[in-house]
């Protein structure tokens, strides 16, 4: 019997390590928009099996004092992982979710029956606070670095963060809440957010930087770990346990992805996370009136917050029936506020609540939409029950499922806004990146902490600890917290946008070159305060400096866009080149195939548009570089010899200015073809100009010349 148990123990330990190694090495990248994984070619069954065997041997030696029967009971859950390991690579995302769940579950069970009573070193609370503070600063620094890096590479859209900055900036200029890029409409005709702009607008007037909003966003996201710690202490968790709760927030993939929010930038709704955690801290501290005040203020952050509070109040009424009057009050206030804002205030600015039309398939008014599960079940359930929606729910719940299912009646409150986003019928909006998950994750994190502090044994405890002895309250809390932390770390690796992990931003950052060194040069060509149009990426470099208006607006004095825009706007680019009202004044080549075009209303500048290029981009152009007789220039020669059927041959000279030069000079070209020699004077005079300026000159070869056997370049002062 003992021999059989030992074999089972060895197999389960090996299976747990093999599952981790096989899935971790089998995923090259996770796509967080379309929700699939790209398999890795480095994954090997043989290598994974051997590595798992070595790791299992080391662990078995370490736990040799623990009875095999106990280890088997803890790790038997890994048998459920086997079907997911057999899935084809195209369905490997299911294996990822399964690994997140089973790794946390097994750790939870191990800590419940095999761990020591003292899980953490006995340190004073100030050390835990200091360590948490350092980690908070580290995450904030990483988030701001990623924000700056993506901004410098023009990966961030003007919307949404540019609009929030624009609205506050226009208000400071006397154009109250005006959104120039939307044709000058009032922002409150789109979203009603007085609670944010009330304090952000004067603060922006003092700081005057477009990056004020990302800094505030980073503080709201990762700085909320301090509030999670405070909430855990108010729930009578130890300093070490409270520190782990802070880690759960810091490594939560939803929180980390909200930093860039799918390249829409910082969203105002991130401000709701610290507000909700503060609300719970005040409730736990015995300050219900202050908590009620925070509740009222949170409604003004965004009208969708009221929908969350309606769902929260209803679920709390079901869980705490003896306090139903209090929750009926908060729910009634939230519902009344939502109806007031969406049916009267916002329509007063724009004529209607535009987001209501996104649910037109469910009904013609709010009542029909609310009853659509019964009135239009095919549309409602057909839109809701989809694979992508299931992935999003797993993404939100799995990292903290071991804790939040202790109060499962409150989970619908977290998912209400997520479900409403799914019912919009736009699959692009259902992903792991956008801000629509903010209210959900804020509440789930608060629920995670408060659920761990709940006394007694609930049905989820009996499920997660099935087959082993039910631990006491102290050990159970730490076991559940350990499972939550491990699942969160696993989820962070697969789904968080950061510098590491399967969803890291390295490949995205490598796609576009860093363009920040050219921003001052481009800004110098555009009059401060002037209106301009262009693409949503390039516009960010002029934020809080110029007014961004729609394409085709008569107010636009300038047009600025990059080569990445040409993937979508080739027709607009051709029209701009042919538009007599605007002239090209600057073309900056960052690398072959990537650059900027800047047009200005009015005639073309004397001598044509200025074309600028970097040294690195110049080296990648066709042809070969020749030694220049003037050190102020680089020269590349690209011969285009005549091919059969062609009548002429030519040589293209690409000349880049390496230093500003005030002198005037002329290049003399000597070309040889067999025994014949000809001298040419490049048809322009080279005056002083900016470093990096690029000139293209084409020489047509004499008739009969199908190639060149000799080339010399000289320079002489211009006459």
Regions picked out by a protein language model, each given a short descriptive name:
Residues 1-16, 45-46, 50-143, 325-330:
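Start-transfer (signal-anchor) and selected internal transmembrane alpha helices
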Residues 35-37, 82-90, 193-201, 206, ...:
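Aromatic- and kink-enriched transmembrane "portal" helix at the membrane-lumen/periplasm boundary
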Residues 54-64, 211-236:
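Transmembrane-helix motifs of polytopic, lipid-linked glycan transferases
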Residues 64-69, 267-271, 275-290, 317-322:
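Membrane-interface transmembrane helices that cradle and orient dolichyl/undecaprenyl
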Residues 71-81, 126-136, 240, 244, ...:
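Signature aromatic-anchored transmembrane alpha helix within multi-pass, membrane-resident enzymes
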Residues 92-105, 225, 307, 412-463:
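Hydrophobic/aromatic-rich transmembrane helices and adjacent perimembrane loops
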Residues 142, 170, 323-406, 410-415, ...:
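Membrane-lumen/periplasm interface segments of specific transmembrane helices
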Residues 162-188, 195:
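Extracytosolic helix-loop segments that constitute the early lumenal/periplasmic catalytic or substrate-binding loops
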């Amino acid at each position: 019997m003992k021999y059989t148990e030992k074999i089972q123990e060895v197999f389960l330990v090996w299976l747990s390590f093999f599952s981790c190694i096989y899935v971790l090495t089998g995923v090259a990248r996770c796509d967080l928009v379309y929700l699939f994984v790209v398999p890795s070619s480095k994954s090997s069954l043989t290598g994974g099996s051997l590595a798992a065997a070595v790791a299992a041997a080391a662990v078995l030696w370490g736990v040799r004092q623990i009875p095999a029967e106990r280890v088997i009971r803890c790790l038997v859950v890994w048998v459920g992982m086997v079907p997911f390991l057999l899935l084809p690579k195209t369905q490997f995302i299911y294996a990822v979710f399964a690994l997140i769940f089973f790794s946390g579950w097994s750790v939870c069970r191990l800590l419940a029956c095999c761990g020591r009573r003292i899980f953490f070193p006995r340190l004073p609370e100030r050390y835990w606070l200091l360590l948490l503070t350092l980690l908070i600063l580290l995450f904030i620094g990483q988030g701001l670095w990623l924000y700056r890096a993506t901004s410098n590479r023009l990966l961030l859209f003007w919307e949404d963060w540019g609009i929030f900055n624009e609205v506050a900036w226009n208000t400071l200029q006397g154009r109250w809440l005006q959104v120039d890029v939307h044709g000058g409409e009032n922002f409150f005709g789109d979203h009603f957010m007085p609670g944010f702009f009330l304090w952000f607008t004067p603060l922006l007037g003092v700081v005057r930087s477009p990056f004020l909003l990302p800094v505030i966003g980073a503080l709201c996201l990762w700085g909320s770990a301090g509030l999670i710690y405070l909430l855990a202490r108010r729930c009578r968790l130890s300093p070490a346990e409270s520190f782990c709760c802070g880690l759960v927030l810091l490594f939560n993939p939803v929180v980390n992805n909200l930093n860039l929010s799918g390249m829409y930038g910082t969203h105002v709704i991130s401000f709701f996370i610290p507000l909700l955690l503060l609300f719970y801290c005040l409730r736990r501290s015995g300050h219900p009136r202050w908590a009620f005040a925070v509740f009222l203020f949170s409604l003004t952050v965004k009208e969708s917050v009221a929908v969350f509070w309606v769902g929260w109040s209803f679920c709390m009424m079901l869980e705490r029936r003896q306090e139903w009057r209090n929750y009926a009050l908060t729910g009634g206030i939230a519902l009344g506020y939502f109806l007031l804002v969406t049916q009267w205030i916002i329509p007063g600015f724009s004529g209607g609540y535009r987001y209501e039309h996104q649910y037109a398939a469910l009904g013609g008014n709010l009542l029909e939409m609310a009853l659509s599960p019964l009135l239009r079940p095919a549309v409602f359930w057909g839109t809701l029950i989809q694979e992508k929606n299931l992935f999003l729910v797993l993404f939100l719940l799995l990292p903290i499922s071991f804790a939040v299912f202790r109060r499962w009646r409150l989970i619908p409150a977290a998912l209400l806004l997520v479900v409403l986003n799914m019912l919009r019928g736009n699959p692009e909006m259902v992903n792991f990146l956008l801000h629509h998950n903010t209210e959900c994750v804020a509440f789930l994190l608060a629920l995670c902490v408060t659920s761990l502090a709940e006394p007694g044994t609930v049905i989820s405890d009996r499920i997660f600890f099935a087959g082993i002895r039910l631990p006491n309250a102290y050990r159970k809390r730490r076991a559940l917290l350990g499972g939550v932390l491990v699942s969160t770390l696993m989820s962070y690796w697969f789904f968080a946008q950061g510098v590491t992990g399967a969803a890291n931003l390295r490949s995205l950052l490598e796609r576009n070159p860093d363009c920040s060194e050219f921003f001052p040069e481009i800004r110098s060509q555009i009059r401060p305060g002037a209106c301009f149009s262009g693409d949503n990426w390039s516009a960010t470099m002029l934020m809080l400096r110029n007014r961004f208006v729609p394409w085709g607006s008569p107010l636009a004095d300038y047009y600025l866009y990059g080569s990445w825009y040409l993937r979508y706007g080739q027709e607009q680019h051709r029209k701009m080149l042919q538009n007599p009202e605007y002239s090209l004044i600057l073309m900056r080549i960052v690398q072959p195939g990537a650059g900027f075009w800047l047009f200005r209303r009015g005639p073309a500048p004397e001598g044509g548009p200025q074309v600028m290029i970097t040294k690195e981009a110049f080296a990648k152009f066709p042809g070969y570089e020749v030694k220049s007789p003037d050190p102020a220039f680089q020269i590349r020669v690209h011969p285009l010899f005549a091919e059969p059927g062609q009548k002429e041959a030519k040589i293209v000279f690409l000349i880049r200015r390496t230093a500003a030069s005030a002198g005037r000079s002329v290049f003399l070209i000597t070309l040889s073809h067999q025994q014949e020699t000809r001298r040419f004077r490049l048809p322009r005079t080279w005056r002083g100009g900016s470093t990096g300026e690029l000139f293209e000159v084409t020489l047509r070869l004499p008739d009969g010349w199908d190639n060149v056997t000799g080339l010399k370049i000289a320079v002489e002062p211009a006459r």
